[in-house]
């Protein structure tokens, strides 16, 4: 690498580095074990969704989406319906999440990485991709979400924020990759989603309501919307993680 390229790489934002990696990763790069585990999480997520489909909060959400969702290529699990990717990602993520049975990863912050899988599903269907791309999306969601969970001590939950805040950073990487966006477009998608979706920890404090298991699906939905906007040329802050008044600036020097 030349001195010029090294200087550029040193100045490159964390968002740009992650976006480059998301855009470049290929199914052939994944180990056999990673693919096997991704398939396990995929099957587990579908099982959770089929159980979630029966729940009252999901039925309410589906009624609302029946009224407002547009036509599209994205499947709503358990219904046989095809709607727009933004609405489908919310419906499917809520089904997976609502019973609290899906996977969990807990380090400095907790998360349920499979909540992000519906972003990959909806966008892969829109892009008419095969199952390999779906597996890539699932792996990306888990890899990035879990890394964010280890980013600082204390985590954002200890500071009064909900981990859906982190999902709003991760889901546009997944959605953007599934839509085959350039790394620059993915970077903008992250800026669009993350800059407007910070979730208060109040949803898990005191009396629990339906929103406890809805905020993360909404963050997943945010990433899909952001990726679709970036695909058309919409821009967002490029240094939303490590720039001025970005994530690390706002949460303090403990963030890595």
Residue ranges and their predicted role:
Residues 2-256:
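N-terminal core-entry segment
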